[in-house]
Amino acid sequence: MEQLKIDLNLGRSQQHDFIYPLIFQEYIYALAHDRGLNRSIFLENAGYDNKFSLLIVKRLITHLITQMYQQNHFLFSVNDSNQKKILGYNTNLYSQMIFEGFAVVVEIPFYLRLLSFLEGKERMKSHNLRSIHSIFPFLEDKFAFLNYVLDIQIPHPIHLEIFIQTLRYWVKDASSLHLLRFFLHEYPIWNSFLIRKKSSFSFSKRNQRFFFFLYNFHVCEYESIFVFLRNQSFHLRSISYETFLERISFYRKIELEEVFTKDFKAILWVFKEPFLHYVRYRGNALLASKGTSLLMNKWKHYIVNFWQCYFYIWSQPRRIDINQLSNHSLDFLGYLSSVRLKHLMVRSQMIENSFLIENASKKFDTLMPITPMIGSLSKAKFCNVLGHPMSKPAWSALSDSDIIERFGRIYRNLSHYYSGSLKKRNLYRIKYILRLSCARTLARKHKSTVRAFLKRLGMGLLEEFFTEEEQVFYLTLPKASSTSGELYRRRVWYLDIICINHMSNYE
């Protein structure tokens, strides 16, 4: 790490050949290797042993560059998919390590620019803003007063060259970009990195960091348009908007303002909208406004044209849906969110006369969708497609305590994440499925009936399915059912959830 600090001084950040020499430094790959082991992203999960040689990595990179200049095939023929060795070494392991090293090296210019930008400036630093649940209080405060929302699926680039062309405006090191381009094009299992799921894409577990970096950079370039819009609209010049925007952007977006102003000045009037709010998670984004349907249609066509003209991405208009918040539920971050009218009758009395006043207010609701959740449980073999609990034969070889702990942890994860649901009835059903599935798994293991096993186990099975809040009410107020009921009518957002991992992959 000390050697890295010596080499990464700000004075060299402007040199064109800054990144290229770092590709041959062994400590870069040692850093990537150690970070990967700590995060359990590769090597351990991929089934490789922990034997690793920095010298082999350096030889492979030298071999790569030699083949690149000779215009020969780099590793092996694309048609020869069964070959597993590079110069006698493990293909998957060392190719993966080269990608991880590239990820560390390419991130360096962005990190240095970030330090330079933040120097002498105060920025709100809060770990709570990393939580997925931090989005929902924002939606509660803003979306209840809006009319329409654009449900956007950000298109995935279908060609590697789009990644490289976008990256070249940031990384001025031509040698490194040529090496990166050659490696990506010659790597024979590029398609295995992208797993197509219906209308979206996701990354496989191998080389996640590097391709997440490329994809997130690409998405941030998409979002550069919103900096331009904020600077052009007086109503969007708010500290809160700027703070949240800077959390999801690279700071070069500010430099794009002049380009957008020059090319889109004629249609700038479309965006003079004081109530404009944008949130994104992964490839899904929501853009809400208080404007009319006509305004949202203009937004839709503008975004599609912007993607096609500046990023050469063919985006089908059906990937952007226009929905009215008052009669549509948003499927976002695992919740079904909607805006509904809440009617309140107030009795008013003046001297001898009394009358009723009806007040209507909008309220932002979040519910747990039961059908997709039962589908996930069915896929994991906890129940059938109708939601009837089943035993888990794969866990029958475990000890009783491990089986109960696994089922209980899955429920606690679900309960923790869906604590923001206004109605907990669906969560009760999930709890019932997991508890009965746990009981049937234990009964199957001991060759007994569910009734007999539950009678023998007693409350021991139930305790693992209590959340921390439920345990407090159960131990202190066991008879206060009304007080306990208040717990299930509350909506709680936790600010420690940084990823969605309901099922706790034990397979």
From Swiss-Prot:
| TM segment ranges | none
Compartments (UniProt record)? Plastid, Chloroplast
Which keywords, in A-to-Z order, does the entry hold? Chloroplast, mRNA processing, Plastid, RNA-binding, tRNA processing
InterPro entries referenced in this protein's UniProt entry, alphabetically: Domain_X, Maturase_MatK, Maturase_MatK_N
Q: Name one GO biological process term.
A: mRNA processing
User: Which terms in the GO cellular component ontology are assigned?
Assistant: chloroplast
- Disulphides: none
What Gene Ontology molecular-function terms does this entry list? RNA binding
- Kindly indicate whether the keyword Chloroplast belongs to this entry: yes
Q: What does this protein do?
A: Usually encoded in the trnK tRNA gene intron. Probably assists in splicing its own and other chloroplast group II introns.
Q: Which family does it belong to?
A: Belongs to the intron maturase 2 family. MatK subfamily.
The name of this protein is: Maturase K
Query: What is the organism field in this record?
Result: Kalmia procumbens
